[in-house]
Amino acid sequence: MADLSKYRNIGIFAHVDAGKTTTTERILKLTGQIHKTGEVHDGESTTDFMEQEAERGITIQSAAVSCFWNDHRFNVIDTPGHVDFTVEVYRSLKVLDGGVGVFCGSGGVEPQSETNWRYANDSKVARIIMVNKLDRLGADFYRVCKQVKDVLGANPLIMTLPIGTEDEFVGVVDLLSEKAYIWDDTGLPENYEVTDIPADMVEQAAEYRVKLIETALEVDEDMLMEFLEGEMVPTIEQIKACIRTGTRDMTFFPTYGASAFKNKGIQLILDAVVDYLPSPTDVNPQPLTDEEGTPNGEFAIVSADETFKALAFKITDDRFGTLTFVRIYSGTLKKGDTILNAATGKTERVGRMCEMQADDRNELTSAQAGDIIAIVGMKSNVQTGHTLCDPKHPIVLEAMVFPKPVISISVTPKDKGSTEKMGLAIGKMVAEDPTFKVETDIDSGETILSGMGELHLDIKVDILKRTYGVELEVGKPQVAYRETITTAIEDSYTHKKQSGGSGQFGKIDYRIKPGEPGSGFVFSSVVVGGNVPKEFFPAIEKGFKGMMDTGVLAGFPVLDVEIELYDGGFHAVDSSAVAFELAARGAFRQSIPKAGAQLIEPIMKVDVFTPDDHVGDVIGDLNRRRGMIGGQEAGVSGVRIKADVPLSEMFGYIGTLRTMTSGRGQFSMEFSHYMPCPNNVAEIVIAEVKAAKIAKDAARK
């Protein structure tokens, strides 16, 4: 079995265009996995292998690649930087042990890098930092380090200093070894020399080296005191051991300067992955849960000697067939083994499995704890987040949680052939992407696609058209409005029906009130005595909960309602579970209007970058879109504006922004929260929904 201490499962995270994919290309070149580096701007990068990725120059899927450096195995996942594809970041973080946060030397801490950093903190993933593109105009290593501290609240542990700035950036000073690494102008990563620190940087390097040592030794108080009192000078290995501890505890983040495009500084980052990021055995083991998702106090111990436990974290369908990407946490898996899908209860035999090199693969006969592999052609309806395990020792790993879609479009196939193709294609696409939802409008028969943003759905439609050959008519984007209540009330409802023989009877007395934001539906009972027998409580809860899907204002789902059953009545003969379920449904229809039904809309956290001379125009436009400006931050080449803006006001924003800023503005947005719609907006939305329903009804007659 392979030595798990020499495994590094890492992700590369950053904002769009900070250089994640280019960095991955350089890693693959240096580790011998590819012999010619492909460039993102040429559409030739190894990990951006989808047609849509190559065209748009962005990473959409998390591509997994394996390589070796200094006798250590790296499983590297290159993740998207665009906010519409954060599902890929979510699921990557679930299966990784460490990461490299890439920041643009001129752009600094940009919106999506901030979001990804927050996700990684939540997942407790240790990271090192790479300040990339130091050859760019306006690049400033020290300013980015300050932003990491001020904006992210993180402690960058500076490990290298850049030699030269912008187009004169030639290499770095390694503070630990007190040596300079200088590359020539050939652009080849192997063409560098290790030399003495340039004379004009000796004093600065000495100052930063002391800071590095003091910060590193803070994880070992005794050693720090001895160092500060002049009683000892720690060896490089002692310093590295402290850095390793502090990195894995996320006390600080080793920080390096580089230019991936110019092939400068990457080797030191690879060394840092080996030296400081955790192996699979260094991180906390994955918790196990019961079937309801509640932790049971047990864990998936990372060891090849344990029973097989793995998580399916990604499903793709490509020219090889269906690939199920799996992180093995415990045990071993051999070709021909039978495994259990804990979610479906089905077992199946593993026919083929492989190690992925972006869109190429190496066939495997076995894999072990710590490995990230792909199983080919699984048939047990495996979906993202499903647990795979030994049939004799069934377990459930902690589930993956994904954000809900906030935008929808309707699509209609143009002919019968496209209808059949679309049905097959959508089934595969839903399995691949948990934030992509599909449903059919009962009234119109239209297919409704829902996702995380305009680009997300644009890519999905493009895949349907070009990958699967589906001819489509696409409707306008629709906002995921919701309904809620604003007032607490007490009410009573009686369901009574008599039509010969036994009838139906159920009476419920209840309190209904607004719930906490994000609480969804909460039901409780404080009934004392036997006025409503306990056996009917589940039916009452089911009745209320079933009505949450369709609000009374415009038929949108209802959010954040608490209902407390406190009394009622029943009939010995006529009461039944069905009668009480119907009573709850009637009660919901009766009480929601009384409780101040209100339309609410999704609010997006919008981050806009604009050149200085267009700030006024951009802020004015955001205000016209009902935006609430949250702050401004001046940068080297422009201003970053933060605002909360209703999603309904953001359609087509990128075109407006480019026009206002002569093509130089950029923005990103992600869902933040729901807020009440202004009355004038609510009236328009409700009227449009009702008009559409009348039109559909008329079309059916």
UniProtKB/Swiss-Prot annotation:
GTP binds at residues 14-21, 78-82, 132-135. One of its GO terms (cellular component) is cytoplasm. It comes from the Bacteria. GO terms for biological process: ribosome disassembly. It is found in: Cytoplasm. Transmembrane segments: none annotated. PANTHER family: ELONGATION FACTOR G 1, TRANSLATION ELONGATION FACTOR G-RELATED. NCBIfam families: EF-G, PRK12740.1-5, small_GTP. This is Elongation factor G 1. It comes from Colwellia psychrerythraea (strain 34H / ATCC BAA-681) (Vibrio psychroerythus). The lineage of its organism: Bacteria, Pseudomonadati, Pseudomonadota, Gammaproteobacteria, Alteromonadales.
